[in-house]
Amino acid sequence: MKMLTEHFDFPKLNFATIVISGATIIGIIFLRYLNYPTKVNVPVVGIGVRYTKWLAAIINVRHARQSIREGYAKYGDFAFQIPTMTRMEVFICDRQMTREYQNVDDYHLSFRAVMTEEFQFKWLLPGQAHEARIIPNSVIAKALSWQRTRANKPSDPFFESFSAEFMQGFQEEMRRLIQYQNSSVMSNRSGAVLDPAHGWHAVPCFPLALKVIGRLTTYVLFGKPLCQDATFLNMCCQFGDVIPRDAIILRSWPALARPLIVKILSAPRVMGKLRNILIVEIKSRRESHETNPMSDILDFTMAWVDRHPNASFDDQHIAEMMINTIFAALHTSSQLVVHTIFELASRPEYSDALLEEIDACFEKHGKGTKAALDSMFKVDSFIKETQRFNPLDASALARLALKDFTFSNGLNIPKGSVIFTPNSPIFEDERYYKDPKVFDGFRFARMRNDPKLGLFCDLTATNEQSMHFGTGRHACPGRFMVSDEVKLAVIHILSNFDFCIENFGPRPANQPFGKFLLPDMSAKIWLREKRAREKNL
């Protein structure tokens, strides 16, 4: 029997022809995929955007921050948009327009919907997707407010336990990392001048920060012994890493392919393991509910669900809410710790003044107390200036239009559009910050003396010129916990260690990716206990 192809006279195709034809077809599909419509009538910023979006979209995969800076410089009194691989992103610069949209209800302009798209919650964390029914975010906000009230009460043992957990976690992670570095050939690579005999140790900064912040965050969320469980802690830290990574992978594929691609990604498996652990923990707590007082965020959330039976939330809803909180809390806090340590190590001229303030506040309010931390205005200022100088996200106030929205000046935002306001360019704007390109560690400490600016100079303060934690009703409710975590880390390292960048080198360069600016995750610092130095002098 003849094969079907034998009935037709196909020309013989060489390999080069097949490759060229295939590449052409893929290229056409790719360009059509990028040829999404421009729905909003504002200027488009990017290379070659007058003719096609694809070149600017590809460049913005890594360098969107430059496009946002360019748009702000040209159209800072109105708005602009930039192309990405999947959509146009609209940036509202005018302050009056920003105020108009930032507090519009979520049924109209939704923060949760844009986060669902940004981090692909439909596939990676389906229980928190925009379409899913979730425990209200206000519950977590109330829980964090309750914990903050406890921290501010001298009679409540919470903050003392919080500080003790930091100390234990820091010491354990330092020992683990030093042992690993001493046994690794990487610690003895060519060019290193490290001298362990005199107390110096090379420590990778981001892994140290991530584990210590993870330990503190899980203590606040789940208490002991779960925060001290190495397997659980590693899983939490891993989850905070795989969600943004896997989301980037998924967003690069058309929607039809995502159900297949997600099957080979890590985030759903890690999420499933975390959910199983937390459901077991929740059931265990319910069995001993009568004998254990409410002590952490999980207890608070369980109590809220129990008080609202008509809401029909179950243990799985609680577990998924807590998993989402883990994701939201870990990486941004850890990165701020890393940036601050890098700035301190490369700017030793600040150390004496900071240490003098730390000693004075401990003497006045007691070592390790919340009152002492809250009175360290120079420490707070240095961290806030670090945040200003190294802003994680070039954008803020993200919203997805679920309905058409029209500003008072007539600009229409059609349904399905994504809007932001520029964030990082504001920190370079001389209208808001004097000498913005100069790092001034005590900039915000001096601002406290200004009656008009004093309320906005604290690390946790939010306004239109400082949107690291958002602003308005979607401002991050966990920012007070973040402030305490970062301050504990900075104070402990300053007070107890000599430290510098590896090989006495310059500050490790930041790593831009799209709208984000990340610290060098692999960079090491050298640490030496101060008592070891004194012994060797």
UniProtKB/Swiss-Prot annotation:
Binding site for heme: C476
Pathway: Secondary metabolite biosynthesis
Record's bilayer topology term: Single-pass membrane protein
One Gene Ontology term of the molecular function aspect: heme binding
Cofactor(s) the record lists: heme
Function text: Cytochrome P450 monooxygenase; part of the gene clusters that mediates the biosynthesis of lolitrems, indole-diterpene mycotoxins that are potent tremorgens in mammals, and are synthesized by clavicipitaceous fungal endophytes in association with their grass hosts. The geranylgeranyl diphosphate (GGPP) synthase ltmG is proposed to catalyze the first step in lolitrem biosynthesis. LtmG catalyzes a series of iterative condensations of isopentenyl diphosphate (IPP) with dimethylallyl diphosphate (DMAPP), geranyl diphosphate (GPP), and farnesyl diphosphate (FPP), to form GGPP.
Protein's recorded name: Cytochrome P450 monooxygenase ltmQ
Source species: Epichloe festucae var. lolii
